[in-house]
Curated annotation (Swiss-Prot):
<dbReference type="InterPro" id="IPR023298">
    <property type="entry name" value="ATPase_P-typ_TM_dom_sf"/>
</dbReference>
<dbReference type="GO" id="GO:1990573">
    <property type="term" value="P:potassium ion import across plasma membrane"/>
</dbReference>
<feature type="region of interest" description="Disordered">
    <location>
        <begin position="13"/>
        <end position="40"/>
    </location>
</feature>
<dbReference type="GO" id="GO:0005889">
    <property type="term" value="C:potassium:proton exchanging ATPase complex"/>
</dbReference>
<feature type="binding site">
    <location>
        <position position="388"/>
    </location>
    <ligand>
        <name>Mg(2+)</name>
    </ligand>
</feature>
<dbReference type="Pfam" id="PF00690">
    <property type="entry name" value="Cation_ATPase_N"/>
</dbReference>
<dbReference type="GO" id="GO:1902600">
    <property type="term" value="P:proton transmembrane transport"/>
</dbReference>
<dbReference type="Pfam" id="PF00122">
    <property type="entry name" value="E1-E2_ATPase"/>
</dbReference>
<keyword id="KW-0479">Metal-binding</keyword>
<feature type="active site" description="4-aspartylphosphate intermediate">
    <location>
        <position position="386"/>
    </location>
</feature>
<feature type="binding site">
    <location>
        <position position="727"/>
    </location>
    <ligand>
        <name>Mg(2+)</name>
    </ligand>
</feature>
<feature type="transmembrane region" description="Helical">
    <location>
        <begin position="813"/>
        <end position="833"/>
    </location>
</feature>
<keyword id="KW-0472">Membrane</keyword>
<feature type="transmembrane region" description="Helical">
    <location>
        <begin position="331"/>
        <end position="348"/>
    </location>
</feature>
<dbReference type="GO" id="GO:0008900">
    <property type="term" value="F:P-type potassium:proton transporter activity"/>
</dbReference>
<feature type="transmembrane region" description="Helical">
    <location>
        <begin position="929"/>
        <end position="948"/>
    </location>
</feature>
<feature type="transmembrane region" description="Helical">
    <location>
        <begin position="142"/>
        <end position="162"/>
    </location>
</feature>
């Protein structure tokens, strides 16, 4: 058991001890288990991994891991280490049971309120049943209806939401199945999960790296780190330590990254959860989901509703006790008022409105996993976006060329209509020949009908870009190569930093060979003695070297990867046909070459991104780039897409312009700021928050997954609602921590998709703008729906208040209220989700979560005490009219309740002296229920029309633009008619046929509501910022 516990703690700590021995540090944390240490563990995982294996010599590595750089571990030691450390696999967390996920759907803010209301109804049912009250069943039906609403909406939410996020399960797809290992000097294949630290492993192109490995030997080794670090360009791996950071150095290969080409041999230095990828997985799964803004708003709303309900209930409980009711009867009244105050239909309204918006977004390639995330995107004030694959295409493309002493922009379109140089130029032909022949990439067969930019290429990103550019300019690059057969080649390696190949010429009458070379521009130039200018070889003197340096710096400053190209015709005399070229002996010249030109490449921005960033800026949303790529490249892309706006300068730019040291520049003068990972590592949280506050335009480069998470947290400390976009494994912790995580659907890793709340199916950053717009619109429309839904609470509540205090026969029954809440008013309420925006909501600043509430005081006051009061007057006017026309004048109704409800009294006289039996009185009471119901519905038609806008006149918005609302109103009227006049309704739901004139009584009140609201809106529009605006605009 001791070893098992050690393994568990080893995975939690993920750091070395003072001597560099990781196991020693694990034992120190042995007492740190338990829930109380979870936060500390998460903070430890946020820290950068402090390992020094990349800086140790081979002898020191052998000593540290008790291994051999030639024979590997002994089999016995490997077995001991496997027992100590456990398998080389990512340890999945304990999954959330499905019943718990479903239970969460039943326990939100509104759900809890409705559960309490249902419990109160059941208690009231029990009390009334014990007293023999005939209205007992109403409370039972109400309780069952409330429970049904919660369960049905819970099922709906559970169905809509994806299965629970399981971060580490998605990382399993990255784990290789087999690994080539050397133990006791013997080479054999084992399952990758059996690897241990100190194992000597071999890798080749096409393999996935089986663990974190310190490279000992490498030949042409390149790996794809894009999903881990965000770098589009393949990364060279070699035995040399090139950087003090283990994430930056070339002699560490990371677990799960893909080997693109070459071979390598190295020692395993970390396995399983202790690897970089394992650390990210643990970090992502350890981050708790934040409450969404809409969830916070609903909690705030529930607090308001519960507080008002208890206040009113307690007030009238005291009143009932004071006027002589028994305690149990007064308690029943208290419960009835509390339940009447609960908007039973609101939960369904909110769920359906969010679902409709989610469906609308899905049609625009945005899939929402969590319904509440729909509104969150609309509240977003900061977007932290990854660069590679999100803002850019994750596809290297030729961008510029320098030849004949001119820089040309490359046209990578099919028709080549934008090409800015003369393709008949001799220098261009030479440069094109070199970049086509000195290239190992090849098109996958059978793609002749596929457009060149979309063709699949076998090869690394740079050579792919060169091949596609060659295909676009030459027409048939592969056929062109066949005309120049390759006889010799030296692949690119980190020592030489060039690639060389020798070819025979296409002209059979010319028996010469041509040597072509590409590589790092400075390395290629130093092997040249001449330069091609307009097809002529000129001596490479100081003038041309300066011209080269100027062009090189210019292209490099754009954040582009620059390659140099040169050639040399080999004389027939020294290198006749059939000459045996030997790459080991290098029996051919590698100097005295002729420089042809420079080609620069970049992972270009998506075409729609600049416009999307501009729209975000217009909408008051700050876009921050957070990438693992180089600072120069990151800054260049940020400038090209508008994250760094034209004219904005960093501290370094200002210092260069003023020709002063950087430390003499006032940092507050710099609008833009580029911070790399090493700088970020040395900053404390307060410094980072201050930098975010000082510089509106921010770019973070060379960041680790831990740092991305810290950046998100810092933005949240400033009060921002943060959206994070990303596609790589390295983005998953930040995606989980953000208020809303947005993953790429095509290029995104499974880990990123699982951590996110929303997935962009088309990988288009511009789709986020659509999401923001829809999110803002649904917030506005939810506000309207809630205002509409709350208004009728007052005419539903006041009958009970009058019933208790004035002792009139009950004007409105529980079942009738249920039909209002869950039947007739649901459709108009939902139809407001289809309402168009009143103005260009993308020109407004994001809402302030602390100030701009979903349900604020003006909304509650206006809905309850103004429109709700008018509806109550309408209802009582219709009620007393119906009672009077049947012989019960208003003054007689006051205090009538005890006799009216006495089922033993069969001869109660009305105002005309007519005697009424209990059955007749009950029939009249049900008629009054129906009259009050119709009155509310007629006023609610006016209410839904005024809710179309909050500021504009309803005439400006148009009555018939929202056809769904028109249909909902017609449906509402039809339902009302059906309930009133369908045979059998009196016996089933207590609805009675009513006279036509009783439909007309509430209409003047509906007109009053409409006129009153138009006056309110006029004042809001005419007096912005005034008392009228502040108190009456909700």
């Amino acid at each position: 058991m001791g070893k098992a516990e050690n393994y568990e703690l080893y995975q939690v700590e993920l750091g070395p001890g003072p001597s560099g021995d990781m196991a020693a540090k694990m034992s120190k944390k042995k007492a740190g288990r338990g829930g109380g240490k979870r936060k500390e563990k998460l903070e430890n995982m946020k820290k950068e991994m402090e390992i020094n294996d990349h800086q140790l010599s081979v002898a020191e590595l052998e000593q540290k891991y008790q291994t051999s750089a030639t024979k590997g571990l002994s089999a016995s030691l490997a077995a001991e280490l496997l027992l100590r450390d456990g398998p080389n696999a990512l340890r999945p967390p304990r999954g959330t049971p499905e019943y718990v996920k479903f239970a969460r759907q039943l326990a939100g803010g509104l759900q809890c309120l409705m559960w309490v209301a249902a419990a109160i109804c059941l208690i009231a049912f029990a009390i009334q049943a014990s007293e023999g009250d005939l209205t007992t069943d109403d409370n039972l039906y109400l309780a069952l209806a409330l429970i049904a609403v919660v369960v049905v909406t819970g099922c709906f939410g559970y169905y809509q939401e994806f299965k629970s996020t399981n971060i580490i399960a998605s990382f399993k797809n990255l784990v290789p199945q087999q690994a080539t290992v050397i133990r006791d000097g013997d080479k054999f294949q084992i399952n990758a999960d059996q690897l241990v630290v100190g194992d000597l492993v071999e890798m080749k192109g096409g393999d996935r790296v089986p663990a974190d490995i310190r490279i000992l030997q490498a030949q042409g080794r390149k790996v794809d780190n894009s999903s881990l670090t965000g770098e589009s360009e393949p990364q060279t791996r070699s035995p040399e330590c090139t950087h003090e950071s283990p994430l930056e150095t070339r002699n560490i290969a990371f677990f799960s990254t893909m080997c693109l080409e070459g071979t390598a041999q190295g020692l395993v230095v970390n396995t399983g959860d202790r690897t970089i990828i394992g650390r990210i997985a643990s970090l992502a799964s350890g981050v708790e989901n934040e409450k969404t803004p809409i969830a916070i708003e609903i909690e705030h709303f529930v607090d308001i509703i519960a507080g008002l309900a208890i206040l009113f209930g307690a007030t009238f409980f005291i009143v009932a006790m004071c006027i002589g009711y028994t305690f149990l009867r007064a308690m029943v009244f208290f419960m009835a008022i509390v339940v009447a105050y609960v908007p039973e239909g609101l939960l369904a309204t909110v769920t359906v409105c969010l679902s409709l918006t989610a469906k609308r977004l899905a049609s625009k390639n945005c899939v929402v996993k969590n319904l509440e995330a729909v509104e969150t995107l609309g509240s977003t004030s900061v977007i932290c976006s990854d660069k590679t694959g999100t803002l850019t295409q994750n596809r290297m493309t030729v961008s510029h060329l320098w030849f004949d002493n001119h820089i040309h922009s490359a046209d990578t379109t099919e028709d080549q209509s934008g090409q800015t140089f003369d393709q008949s130029s001799e220098t261009w032909r030479a440069l094109c020949r070199v970049l086509t022949l000195c290239n190992r990439a090849a098109f996958k067969s059978g793609q002749d009908a596929v457009p060149v930019p979309k063709r699949i290429v076998i090869g690394d990103a740079s050579e792919t870009a060169l091949l596609k550019f060659s295909e676009l300019t030459l027409g048939n690059a592969m056929g062109y190569r066949e005309r120049f057969p390759k006889v010799c080649e030296i692949p690119f390696n980190s020592t030489n930093k060039f690639q060389l190949s020798i070819h025979t010429l296409e002209d059979p009458r010319d028996p010469r060979h041509v040597l072509v070379m590409k590589g790092a521009p400075e390395r290629v130039l130093e092997r040249c003695s001449s330069i091609l200018i307009k097809g002529q070889e000129l001596p490479l003197d100081e003038q041309w070297r300066e011209a080269f340096q100027t062009a090189y710096l210019s292209l490099g400053g754009l954040g582009e990867r620059v390659l140099g190209f040169c050639q040399l015709y080999l004389s027939e005399k020294d290198y006749p046909p059939g000459y045996a070229f030997d790459v080991e002996a290098m029996n051919f010249p590698t100097s005295g070459l002729s420089f042809a030109g420079l080609v620069s490449m970049i992972d270009p921005p998506r075409a729609t991104v600049p416009d999307a960033v501009l729209k975000c800026r217009t909408a008051g949303i700050r876009v921050i780039m957070v990438t693992g790529d180089h600072p120069i490249t990151a800054k260049a892309i940020a400038a090209s897409v508008g994250i760094i706006s034209e004219g904005s300068e960093t501290v370094e730019d200002i210092a260069a312009r003023l020709r002063v040291p950087v430390d003499q520049v006032n940092r507050k003068d710099a609008r833009a700021c580029v911070i790399n990972g090493m700088q970020l590592k040395d900053m404390d949280p307060s410094e980072l928050v201050e930098a975010l506050r000082t510089h509106p335009e921010m770019v973070f480069a060379r960041t680790s997954p831990q740092q991305k998470l810290v950046i998100v947290e810092s933005c949240q400390r400033l009060g921002a609602i943060v959206a994070v976009t990303g596609d790589g494994v390295n983005d998953s912790p930040a995606l989980k921590k953000a208020d809303i995580g947005v993953a790429m659907g095509i290029a995104g890793s499974d880990a990123a998709k699982n951590a996110a709340d929303m997935i962009l199916l088309d990988d288009n950053f511009a789709s986020i703008v659509t999401g923001v717009e829809q999110g803002r619109l649904i917030f506005d429309n939810l506000k309207k729906s809630i205002a509409y839904t709350l208004t009728k609470n007052i005419p539903e509540l006041t009958p009970y208040l009058i019933y208790i205090t004035v002792s009139v026969p009950l004007p409105l029954g529980c079942i009738t209220i249920l039909f209002i809440e869950l039947c007739t008013d649901i459709f108009p309420s939902v139809s407001l989700a289809y309402e168009k925006a009143e103005s260009d909501i993308m020109h407004l600043r994001p809402r302030n979560p602390k100030r701009d509430r979903l349900v604020n005081e003006p909304l509650a006051a206006y809905s309850y005490f103004q429109i709700g009061a008018i509806q109550s007057f309408a209802g009582f006017t219709d009620y007393f009219t119906a009672m009077a026309q049947e012989g019960w004048f208003p003054l007689l109704c006051v205090g009538l309740r005890p006799q009216w409800e006495n089922h033993h009294l069969q001869d109660l006289q009305d105002s005309y002296g007519q005697e009424w039996t209990f059955g007749q009185r009950l029939y009249q009471q049900y008629t009054c229920y129906t009259v009050f119901f119709i009155s509310i519905e007629m006023c609610q038609i006016a209410d839904v029309l005024i809710r179309k806008t909050r500021r504009l006149s309803a005439f400006q918005q148009g009555f018939f633009r929202n056809r769904i609302l028109v249909i909902a109103i017609v449906f509402q009227v039809c339902i009302g008619c059906f309930l009133c006049y369908c045979p059998g309704m009196p016996n089933i739901f207590n609805f009675m046929p009513i006279r036509f004139q009783w439909w007309l009584v509430p209409m003047p009140f509906g007109l009053l509501i409409f006129v009153y609201d138009e006056i309110r809106k006029l004042g809001v529009r005419c007096c912005p910022g005034s008392w009228w605006d502040q108190e009456l605009y909700y």
